[in-house]
């Protein structure tokens, strides 16, 4: 029994250990179960969060889809609207182009029958004029004949300002092309001697003119500086003089004298142009024109102030101020002289070192300044520019139309009674055409075309066209098939009036810009782009204008 009891005890111990092990295992399992439960709870929470996020994302996606759908719809609408607008714009453009193109068939001019650019040569594009021109091949100058070369004559040299603003000298029979076209002037004489030799100008002894030379634009100048002994004085000082005893004779038909020069000086100083007369024994002061540098204001004084016209124009490139004054003589005045003078500031005195730069002094017989004439020890004369083409193959009968660019170099006082654009030489009155400026007080500076009646030598002028204050313009005229005529200036036309002109049968010349070598009807200005048509042009085709 003891052994059985021992065995039972041993078995009981074994079972106890097994029970203990099982209990431990149960604890471990319980712990694992608890951990698993916690993980499951965490997973469940994560799953719930993920589910919520998924629902939110789905909602957002749905919203975005609706937004995209709306945007797509709007885009479609915008595209449709854009297509509609583009179509409307295209239709409008087509309509505008159609409307704009329609008038041009009346604006574009046909090829002129006579076309002379007068820009840089005497060559004609169309028309007829047998003459000669010079061409340079290597070092050789050759004279070549041609049938489209305008005839040009001038019996003297002449000066001009080329298209680069440089003072230049043209040879005998050489045309002068400036910025505005072909320069056409009548005969003029410069009464200032040694006009292009500054060191020998007849200035007062109180002026120092030793600083002289030629500037970069070719102008011979002197810096006319007051000497120290004049500091504090208020009197004017002569820079160049033509005494009235050696001056211009105004006892005949010519009643105008013009003095001109180019000047520069510090602001406030003044240049005075003075006129005097001489009756054979006594010199008498007539009047002054004062130019104030800086403001370019001109003041006139003296008993003849109301007979003086003066202007000043500054070249912004060269800096030179072109200053001119014209006086009209009255009955009883025989000889008139002129002086170019320095004057101190208005109401002031000469200060140390005051100066005026002076160039191109000129004193001439006429109502406007003309191109500079170089003189030596005596007055010198520039001959008239004579410009012609034949009427043959250029003008025959009506209709006849003309357009030309014109620039006149004169203002309030004309160079003569009827400055010409063109006329005919030596034809019967009924064949004559005169295209010119009017210089009467009522229609001063306006254009007219003059033709004659068949039965008499009475001329009939057109109604005048143009503004008196406009110097540069495109002028023209029409002579229609129905026997009417009119004048045009910068596109503004007069009313038509009757003319008996039917054509020119006489073989003669068209005189352009002047009538005779005496210069009594010369333009004193520029012509460019002269055109003639043997047909009628529309109003739109005649509407050219420049400023």
Predicted regions and their residues:
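Extracellular and organelle-lumenal recognition/adhesion modules and their flexible linkers in secreted
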Residues: 95-547
